[in-house]
Amino acid sequence: MSRRRQIYEGKAKILYEGPEPGTIIQYFKDDATAFNAEKKGTISGKGVINNRISEHVFTRLSHIGIPTHFIRRLNMREQLVRQCEIIPIEVVVRNVAAGSISKRLGIPEGEPLPHTLIEYYYKDDSLGDPLIAEEHIACFNWASPEEMQDIASMAIRINDFMAGMFAAIDIRLVDFKLEFGRIYDGDFSRVILADEISPDGCRLWDMNSGEKLDKDRFRRDLGGESEAYQEVARRLGLLDEDRNNGEGGPGEVFDMSAHRSRLRGTPTPPKK
């Protein structure tokens, strides 16, 4: 078997040349980093769980008309995706104050925001991925005004869908990170969702206990990272799919408008 050509290795994934033109194989690692890679470690089985969760979320998003780079899962750690030109912007969607916004603005962690907030960060590890405004994006031509309209619109739609999906399994979607890319068709291009969606890039809190089910367990030395990631997959019905011949699933997705108040309710502090 011929050796695959590695294209890029990041903090959580390795990209290989795909079997067909315009495709890439995305390999999920167990490596974990935080604070712009100042903290490094390993979460056992993380790559397998993230591959499965990301496949599930991207597939469901495609069903509501969100264009994505995902093609299919190849094995436990790899998926085939469409090659695209990554837009150098991290899009962070926030429903509840946590992490950097609490530190920057002095908002208590766990306080619901008045409305969903979209933030943009410039993707550059050497600069610490700084927070930027849409004026920066336009000034430096990182994305066109039309692309930014598409990105913002998709981000809100993704948030509404995912918040409902997680609310259905008693998980509060606090915030999450998205990345987008361009694909070209002759002289025209369009924006698609890229990268991954998993507990690595989402803050997910149990609605009843407030327990963190995401990478904050690694950031804050809480322990139990593997168990938390597995719990998210279990609630989504992904760990039982083999036994159900691939038909297992998370069940009904709640209507967002009917359950927004529950989503944003203040959780009970976790027991110590």
Swiss-Prot record:
Region (Disordered), start-end ranges: 239-272
GO molecular function: ATP binding; phosphoribosylaminoimidazolesuccinocarboxamide synthase activity
BP GO terms, sorted: 'de novo' IMP biosynthetic process; cobalamin biosynthetic process
Full protein name: Phosphoribosylaminoimidazole-succinocarboxamide synthase
Enzyme class, broadest EC rank: ligase
Catalysed reaction equations from the record: 5-amino-1-(5-phospho-D-ribosyl)imidazole-4-carboxylate + L-aspartate + ATP = (2S)-2-[5-amino-1-(5-phospho-beta-D-ribosyl)imidazole-4-carboxamido]succinate + ADP + phosphate + 2 H(+)
Gene3D superfamilies reported in the protein's UniProt record: ATP-grasp fold, B domain, Phosphorylase Kinase, domain 1
UniProt keyword annotations, A-Z: ATP-binding, Ligase, Nucleotide-binding, Purine biosynthesis
Pathway where it operates: Purine metabolism; IMP biosynthesis via de novo pathway; 5-amino-1-(5-phospho-D-ribosyl)imidazole-4-carboxamide from 5-amino-1-(5-phospho-D-ribosyl)imidazole-4-carboxylate: step 1/2
EC numbers: 6.3.2.6
Any one Gene Ontology cellular component term annotated for this protein: cytosol
Record-stated family: Belongs to the SAICAR synthetase family.
Matches recorded under Pfam families: SAICAR_synt
InterPro entries cross-referenced by the UniProt entry: SAICAR_synt/ADE2_N, SAICAR_synt_PurC, SAICAR_synth, SAICAR_synthetase, SAICAR_synthetase_CS
Stored CDD domains: SAICAR_synt_PurC
